[in-house]
């Protein structure tokens, strides 16, 4: 839903996409950090979870800074967010926070990826199907 909101934001106010680009990039990175920070607080007394979460965060930071295309970054990041989404479902408070943050992460991500000239919204949704697949498969396994 966050991706849809981001695309709608650019469709409604396309003239704001370029001036807000820098802020969208910072907001996307900050929200991504918060997505990893809240489970860290929840699992604070379990060092194994903290270490796994830190390794996971380092991997996401590596992807963030080494891949050039935002669409390719999004494929990996949203697949990883699907795992966090599933793991947070065990605690309703953490699940509400993580769900909200994943939604909020989708708004600037889609706003940065969407091109009104190219009309690439199918590519955006297809490249982020990893989130739905991972979260759905993890739920049924």
What function would you assign to each model-found segment?
Residues 1-50, 123-141:
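Alpha-helical transmembrane segments and their cytosolic membrane-interface
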Residues 19-26, 71, 91-95, 121:
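Hydrophobic, aromatic-rich alpha-helical transmembrane segments
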Residues 47-117:
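Membrane-proximal helix-loop-helix units in multi-pass membrane proteins
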């Amino acid at each position: 839903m966050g991706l849809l909101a981001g695309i709608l934001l650019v469709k409604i106010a396309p003239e704001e996409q370029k001036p807000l680009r820098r802020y969208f990039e910072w907001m996307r990175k900050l929200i991504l950090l918060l997505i990893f920070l809240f489970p860290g607080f929840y699992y604070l007394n379990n060092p194994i979870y903290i270490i796994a979460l830190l390794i996971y965060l380092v991997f996401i930071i590596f992807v963030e800074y080494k891949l050039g295309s935002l669409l390719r970054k999004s494929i990996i990041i949203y697949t990883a967010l699907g795992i966090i989404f599933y793991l947070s479902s065990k605690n309703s408070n953490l699940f509400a926070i993580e769900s909200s943050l994943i939604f909020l992460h989708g708004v600037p991500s889609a706003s940065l990826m969407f091109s009104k000239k190219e009309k690439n919204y199918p590519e955006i949704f297809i490249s982020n199907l990893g989130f739905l697949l991972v979260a759905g498969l993890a739920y049924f396994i």
